[in-house]
C-alpha cells in the first residue's frame, strides 16, 4: 500500500489500491501473477499480471499488466523494466498468448507493446486514453480473425481504472 501511495498521486492511488488489494484474493484460473522488487528489506517495485477471460470463448489466454509501481526515488534505475521482462518471460513459460496494457505507449513500446494488437481485443469499458491501449503477442500467440471482447478479474472490473 505504501508503495502505491508513494508512486501515484493521492487521487490515482485511491483508485488503484482496491485493485492491488483485490488481486491476491482473485480466485482465477489461470492465476494472477504478482512480482516485487526489494532492496534492504523494502519493497521498491511491484507489478501484477491478471488473466482476462474472452466473452466469446475464443480460447485466447491473455493477461493485463496492471499495475506497475516503482518508488519515485528508485525510478529510472531499471526496476520497472526488470519486473516487466521477468513477468513476460513467466507468462510465455505458462503458454499465455498475449499481454495487454493500458499505459504510456512510449514506455511500453520499448518492450514490444503495439497499438495495433489491441484493436482485436475490446476493453470492458470506454477508455479515457484509447492510444494507451496496447498489446504484445507472446511466442505462439496469434491475432483473432474477429474482435474479441473480454472480462477482467473483478478487481480490475472498475470503469474508473479505464
What are these regions (language model features)?
Residues 1-22, 28-43, 133-134, 139-141, ...:
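Short amphipathic alpha-helix that is part of the acyltransferase structural core
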Residues 42, 71-82, 93-94, 110-111:
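Conserved glycine-rich acetyl-CoA-binding loop
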Residues 65, 70, 76-89, 101:
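Conserved acetyl-CoA-binding loop-helix of GNAT-fold acetyltransferases
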Residues 34-36, 41-53, 62-69:
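Conserved beta-strand in the GNAT
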Residues 7, 90, 107:
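Short alpha-helical functional segments enriched in proximate histidine and acidic residues
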Residues 93-97, 102-128:
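Conserved active-site alpha-helix within GNAT-family acetyltransferase domains
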Residues 20-25, 119-123:
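Short, solvent-exposed loop/turn elements at beta->coil junctions and helix N-caps
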Residues 49-50, 83-87, 115-120:
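Short acidic (Asp/Glu) patches
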Amino acid at each position: 500500500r505504501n508503495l502505491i501511495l508513494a508512486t501515484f498521486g493521492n487521487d490515482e492511488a485511491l483508485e488503484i489500491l482496491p485493485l492491488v488489494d483485490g488481486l491476491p484474493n482473485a480466485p482465477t484460473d489461470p492465476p494472477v501473477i504478482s512480482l516485487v522488487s526489494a532492496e534492504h528489506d523494502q519493497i521498491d517495485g511491484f507489478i501484477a499480471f491478471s488473466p482476462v477471460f474472452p466473452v466469446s470463448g475464443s480460447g485466447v489466454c491473455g493477461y493485463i499488466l496492471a499495475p506497475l509501481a516503482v518508488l519515485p526515488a528508485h525510478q529510472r534505475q531499471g526496476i520497472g523494466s526488470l519486473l516487466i521482462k521477468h513477468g513476460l518471460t513467466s507468462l510465455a513459460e505458462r503458454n499465455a498468448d498475449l499481454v495487454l496494457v493500458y499505459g504510456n505507449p512510449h514506455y511500453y513500446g520499448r518492450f514490444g507493446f503495439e497499438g495495433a494488437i489491441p484493436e482485436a481485443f475490446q476493453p470492458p469499458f470506454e477508455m479515457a486514453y484509447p492510444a494507451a491501449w496496447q498489446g504484445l503477442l507472446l511466442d505462439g500467440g496469434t491475432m483473432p480473425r474477429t474482435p474479441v471482447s473480454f472480462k477482467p478479474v473483478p478487481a480490475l472490473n472498475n470503469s474508473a481504472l479505464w
